[in-house]
């Protein structure tokens, strides 16, 4: 029947990024890829990422957070999802600051500069080709050789690549809506240059403090927002000296503020986390789960 049958959940969103939060700290158990897919199946709870809180493994942390995409694959990081998790735990505990463990490492969260906003310290970006990772060596990952379309007239080319705990490729364009990301996204996500697949972003630098973007998420497809992609894009633009270290990011679902902090290289993401409804998983969803 599976771990999640009859278990409570919260449906939330981070600027349109559809999030389901499940707290298993009082019932430690692993969630399988099959269960994660079942949650998003017809009759279930549609989501982009499933955030599962499990008992803390390290002192001083609230939980180990496992993150699943709607195809059942695990993600190392999800900034929008972490804001949703943070809101739920803030409201339950009344604490001023929280630390969670994820596959990407420790993430600290605190109340944002205004009511309803939450900040997540996403840690430092990584630029080495092995760290992203890429399948072959590139000494300079500010741009890599990768294109879509004819050699002499590519539609997209020369993306910047960054790891924010998960791999990102950012293509710089004049208009993020002028390209068929729904078509190119899955092809680029699964390109051989990305051995762990990649999140694919189209970004337009509208000013030194404003970037417009759309993302095809690895394992989730087109989403209204991707927090780690916003972080990666802001960092990549600053690295090219085309944007400042504090940038407003404009995504289809809303806005985020990203700061690439100079003193320690950490990337801070600030934005809302919206509670939609609470429920209990229907056991019928997991009838075929071993």
From Swiss-Prot:
<keyword id="KW-0963">Cytoplasm</keyword>
<dbReference type="InterPro" id="IPR001653">
    <property type="entry name" value="DAP_epimerase_DapF"/>
</dbReference>
<comment type="subunit">
    <text>Homodimer.</text>
</comment>
<dbReference type="GO" id="GO:0008837">
    <property type="term" value="F:diaminopimelate epimerase activity"/>
</dbReference>
<feature type="binding site">
    <location>
        <position position="49"/>
    </location>
    <ligand>
        <name>substrate</name>
    </ligand>
</feature>
<keyword id="KW-0028">Amino-acid biosynthesis</keyword>
<protein>
    <recommendedName>
        <fullName>Diaminopimelate epimerase</fullName>
        <ecNumber>5.1.1.7</ecNumber>
    </recommendedName>
</protein>
<dbReference type="InterPro" id="IPR018510">
    <property type="entry name" value="DAP_epimerase_AS"/>
</dbReference>
<feature type="binding site">
    <location>
        <begin position="79"/>
        <end position="80"/>
    </location>
    <ligand>
        <name>substrate</name>
    </ligand>
</feature>
<keyword id="KW-0457">Lysine biosynthesis</keyword>
<feature type="binding site">
    <location>
        <begin position="227"/>
        <end position="228"/>
    </location>
    <ligand>
        <name>substrate</name>
    </ligand>
</feature>
<dbReference type="GO" id="GO:0009089">
    <property type="term" value="P:lysine biosynthetic process via diaminopimelate"/>
</dbReference>
<feature type="binding site">
    <location>
        <begin position="217"/>
        <end position="218"/>
    </location>
    <ligand>
        <name>substrate</name>
    </ligand>
</feature>
<feature type="binding site">
    <location>
        <position position="166"/>
    </location>
    <ligand>
        <name>substrate</name>
    </ligand>
</feature>
<feature type="binding site">
    <location>
        <position position="199"/>
    </location>
    <ligand>
        <name>substrate</name>
    </ligand>
</feature>
<comment type="pathway">
    <text>Amino-acid biosynthesis; L-lysine biosynthesis via DAP pathway; DL-2,6-diaminopimelate from LL-2,6-diaminopimelate: step 1/1.</text>
</comment>
<feature type="binding site">
    <location>
        <position position="17"/>
    </location>
    <ligand>
        <name>substrate</name>
    </ligand>
</feature>
<feature type="binding site">
    <location>
        <position position="69"/>
    </location>
    <ligand>
        <name>substrate</name>
    </ligand>
</feature>
<comment type="function">
    <text>Catalyzes the stereoinversion of LL-2,6-diaminopimelate (L,L-DAP) to meso-diaminopimelate (meso-DAP), a precursor of L-lysine and an essential component of the bacterial peptidoglycan.</text>
</comment>
<feature type="active site" description="Proton acceptor">
    <location>
        <position position="226"/>
    </location>
</feature>
<feature type="active site" description="Proton donor">
    <location>
        <position position="78"/>
    </location>
</feature>
<dbReference type="Pfam" id="PF01678">
    <property type="entry name" value="DAP_epimerase"/>
</dbReference>
<feature type="site" description="Could be important to modulate the pK values of the two catalytic cysteine residues">
    <location>
        <position position="168"/>
    </location>
</feature>
<comment type="similarity">
    <text>Belongs to the diaminopimelate epimerase family.</text>
</comment>
<keyword id="KW-0413">Isomerase</keyword>
<dbReference type="GO" id="GO:0005829">
    <property type="term" value="C:cytosol"/>
</dbReference>
<feature type="site" description="Could be important to modulate the pK values of the two catalytic cysteine residues">
    <location>
        <position position="217"/>
    </location>
</feature>
């Amino acid at each position: 029947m599976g771990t999640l049958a009859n278990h409570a959940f919260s449906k939330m969103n981070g600027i349109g990024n559809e999030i389901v939060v499940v707290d298993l700290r009082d019932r430690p158990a692993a969630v399988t890829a099959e269960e994660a897919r079942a949650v998003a199946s017809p009759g279930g709870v549609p989501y982009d990422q499933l955030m599962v809180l499990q008992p803390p493994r390290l002192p001083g942390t609230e939980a180990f957070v496992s993150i699943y995409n709607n195809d059942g694959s695990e993600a190392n990081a999800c900034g929008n999802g972490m804001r949703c998790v943070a809101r739920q735990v803030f409201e339950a505990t009344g604490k001023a600051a929280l630390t969670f463990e994820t596959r990407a490492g420790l993430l600290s969260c605190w109340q944002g500069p205004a009511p309803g906003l939450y900040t997540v310290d996403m840690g430092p970006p990584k630029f080495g080709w092995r760290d992203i990772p890429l399948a072959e060596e590139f000494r300079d990952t500010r741009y890599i050789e990768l294109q879509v379309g004819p050699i002499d007239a590519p539609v997209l080319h020369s993306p910047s690549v960054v790891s924010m705990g998960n791999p990102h490729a950012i293509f710089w364009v004049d208009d993020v809506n002028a390209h068929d990301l729904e078509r190119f996204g899955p092809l680029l996500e699964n390109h051989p240059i990305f051995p762990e697949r990649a999140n694919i972003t189209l970004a337009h630098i509208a000013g030194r403090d404003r970037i417009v973007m759309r993302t095809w998420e690895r394992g989730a497809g087109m989403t209204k927002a991707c927090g780690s992609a916003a972080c990666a894009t802001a960092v990549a633009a600053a690295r090219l000296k085309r944007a400042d270290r504090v940038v407003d990011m404009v995504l289809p679902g809303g806005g985020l503020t990203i700061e690439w902090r100079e003193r320690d290289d950490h990337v801070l993401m600030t934005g809302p986390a919206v509670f939609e409804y609470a429920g209990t998983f229907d056991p019928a969803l997991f009838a075929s789960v071993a």
